Regions:
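Amphipathic protein-protein interaction modules
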Residues: 63-130
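Acidic, proline/glycine-rich low-complexity IDRs
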Residues: 1-29, 33-39, 101-152
């Protein structure tokens, strides 16, 4: 449950981050349309979820959030290539099904909806293609694309 009574911390780039349960933070950043087109309603936000474990507010948590922000920025700088990787390595049948649906080409429909960073600083990019399931791309410790899977 998100505690919206006030931010748990405010990061210089990520902005206000709110408690998300006992071991996480959640926030939203606006992305430049050059990085990712806005949502259908014009909103430029992307959800950011950071796993923090049992870290208490203070310098250690601040350092963790800073490291998460650096990982997110790195992934966003490489977003076009990571998006291609996600499409090329999507589960069998998934890309074929979506490519056959009416509308723009699949690469243009794959929409970065959220970014998660684990306690171990592993980044996951959650892409929406307009249906219920999301296509998730997990990056490894060095930031390279590692695994693509569906999440409900």
């Amino acid at each position: 449950m998100i505690d919206r009574s006030g931010p748990a911390l405010v990061h210089a780039w990520l902005g206000a981050m709110y408690l998300d349960g006992a071991d996480g933070l959640i926030g939203w950043i606006d992305l430049d349309p050059a990085v990712r087109p806005p949502r259908d309603n014009g909103s430029r936000d992307v959800e950011i979820v950071l796993e923090t474990g049992a870290l208490e507010p203070g310098p250690v948590l601040d350092a963790h959030v800073g490291a998460c922000a650096a990982r997110i920025r790195d992934a966003l700088e490489r977003l076009p290539g990571l998006t291609r990787y996600a499409l090329e390595h999507a589960p069998a049948g998934w890309a074929g099904y979506y490519a056959g649906q009416p509308g723009p080409p699949l690469p243009d429909r794959l929409f970065l909806d959220g970014i998660r960073v684990s306690e171990q600083l592993l980044v996951s990019l959650d892409f929406d293609a307009g249906e219920l399931d999301q296509l998730t791309l997990r990056l490894g410790h060095e930031g390279a694309a590692e695994r693509v899977f569906l999440t409900p």
